[in-house]
Amino acid sequence: MDSAEYERKIAHRFAAFDQDGNDYIDRADFNAAAARLLTEFGTKARCDKGQALYTGAEAFWQGMAGIADVDGDQRVTREEFVGGAVKRLRDNPGRFAEIARPFLRAAIAVAGSTETDGSTVATVAAVERALRVLGAEEDVASTAAGSLDTDGDGTIAEADVVAAVAAYFTVIEPDA
């Protein structure tokens, strides 16, 4: 991958977190994502699912800030994101799964999850809606959600969502 491709990928990853477009990632971005999901799926913030989503958003923010907020100002700039989050997540993709899992689990529950064999799943359509609400273009959301249904049964397991999100945010550096 060349440097221009790397920069494009980083910009997309950063924009996915920067929900309000103010050029930095902060707690408000994670809360905004939670609020959008709750509104889209008609879930009240004070119910168990709503509280779990906000708790997951806070855990996600704390994890992101812990690995990327170098100056401690409770904001992650693009430079901090590239130098901190992207590098650390590339070095340890499992770390991303750890910090993202509570939010993703709660998001799946809000999207209308069902339990199958002890795992949480959501329909492909629900995951597609969630991706659109979080800022993905319609065609990208459709393709991404469809690709997560690996067995073709119309549902997507939590583990598949976590793995896919971790893979998406693990950006390989450009060729030297």
Predicted regions and their residues:
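Short helix-capping and inter-helix turn/linker motifs at the boundaries of alpha-helical repeat units
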Residues: 1-5, 55-56, 98-99, 134-136
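Well-ordered, non-transmembrane segments within structured domains
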Residues: 81, 85, 97-104
